[in-house]
């Protein structure tokens, strides 16, 4: 097995850490269509901050390319491209389809194509395999084979890394399932779980994030109820958390490449086969509306303080979808920006983690370098970056005018230190 060369297709948050680990042990070619990304990696720079320059150096058998010719000799192809949703919240399989076309054009007899992208159950064999067959002229499970091992990367998490998270694996035949499982065992210290088939592995991945999404939706709904009852949500959760089996979820904006996206893949397939998934979609609607709810609460607090909402200066602290990482994918902080904008507010976004060019390109939001003291009518703590945790209450309030509103989404401050929080 170790003599087989791997092509890693897609070098983002998922693909690069995987390529680095395999690249410590065997020949790996990292392929990506983004030339700027490839140039950075060749210079030892990972803009996602998932791997350090030292880790890149340790992957002595790893090389990078945008040239399709360079991966023709590979016999194992691991595809780690994004699987987003479109503006109608439907699965957008374009990156997966395009990458399948790419791999199919260089596919040879005996090759194995392993997908890591999150999809609905059946997508690998219903969508990807026909493309591979069409592009290559080869027959599935006769000339080439497929595997599936869903990614479990948690961006920004330096404790749970690719090697320390148990890996689910599957293959299109029992023999290939074993081969795929043994491949991942080379690098996964936490061990593997060989699923009975590809559909089972696909379903396992998509429900991991659906379960989390539904749980957060429940807590978000409780936060809405407790707000009307004038009860502090965190105090309730701390009290309930003293029972051993109470799950430690917190309310908030639900974004990112997984939790706010994956449920729509499952519900899409459910509707396709004639089942209307009520609870999952109800949870999605609730979570998707939290940005609007926060702006509504901040606006009411401003009105109570006789602060004009129209033309108000608003400071939003944080733009990434989670703390301590530069990942902007599907961040729901943009909902705050848009909602405040609908009231003709002047919104400044401050986030020391983000790439400003990326923020402008993705959301037409240009983050400021530093907040201006004494400028803002309302301050919203949206992301729990360490840089914000290190600020004192006085330092945060210094950004506001004398009569400003301070709203805390992430419980960075105590209840009696802010005007409102989830």
Explain the meaning of each model-derived region.
Residues 1-422:
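Structural/interface elements that position substrates and couple domains in central-metabolism enzymes
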